[in-house]
Amino acid sequence: SLCNAFPTLFDAIDESETMELDGVSRHVYWEVVDHCYLCDVCYMTKCPYVPPHEWNVDFPHLMLRAKAVKHSQGKTRTRDRILTSTDLVGTLAGIPVVSSVVNAVNRNKAGRRVLEELLEVHPDAHLPEYHSDTLRRRVDVTRNQDAEAAPEAGPTRGKVALFATCYGNYNEPDLGEDLIAVFEHNDIPVRLADTRRCCGMPKLELGDLPAVAKAKDVNIPQLAALVDRGWDIVAPVPSCVLMFKQELPLMFPDDPDVIKVRDAMFDPFEYLMARHKDGLLKTEFKESLGKV
């Protein structure tokens, strides 16, 4: 249930001459760092040494510090710089003719061999499709800007600004449309957030903290302005929600707008469940959900 950082580390310890950490080669340390993708599962569910334990171990953020050091030393591969530029890649791959070519290459064995050679992308790795008909093209960005909020429920204020995310905009626009339909079925007005910049999570996972700060400087003022006008913020991708609710507040604890956005940011299911607890979620389905 954990990433490959742990088996890599434990196997290296077992195979070392001392069978202790001091016997592990330093190059293995970087393999461990590269395998960690900051999912926080070890911190949240497995590690016994997290706070309030006196050792106060936060393994994911320890790995993040190492990634940041590596990036600051100019050791980031070009491949990783490209693949983590999700908004730029999405913009280019979302051009009508280009999207068709990109999708065709991603589905073609010869094309995948080229990708493997150029970017070291495994030929069997699943790659998402790109859409020229993005979510921001499908949904009028001026919709519901002056909408009246539905009744409040728990921490929710009854109207939602959708942060589309790179994946939700370029790769799965149906996801955003479906989410809007569910919210509006429950009388919750939805508009799109103005910002179209990546949340910064891919760059965070790369250790590129200056790029994270730049994304924050674009996104946070726009999202904070929406919060000031009474909007809750929802994002369809969990890692993007985590970025605004946890990572940015940890990096910028003294920025009041970061804290403001954190407190108004919701996972879609978290938001709907809060409404459900106050009896404001419509659960009269035309067809049975069956066994879940």
Task: Label each region the model flagged.
Residues 42, 54, 174:
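Residue-level signal for short amphipathic helical patches enriched in basic/charged
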Residues 57-292:
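Iron-sulfur cluster-binding electron-transfer modules in prokaryotic oxidoreductases
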Residues 11, 41, 90-91:
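Short alpha-helix boundary/capping elements
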Residues 1-3, 36-47, 166, 199, ...:
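Short cysteine clusters
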Residues 32, 37, 52, 166-170, ...:
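Short, charged/polar micro-motifs that form catalytic or ligand-binding hotspots
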Residues 30-36, 41, 193:
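Processing junctions and N-termini across compartments
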Residues 2-35, 49-79:
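Non-heme iron-sulfur electron-transfer modules
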Residues 45-53, 246, 250:
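General structural signal for alpha-helix termini and helix-helix connectors
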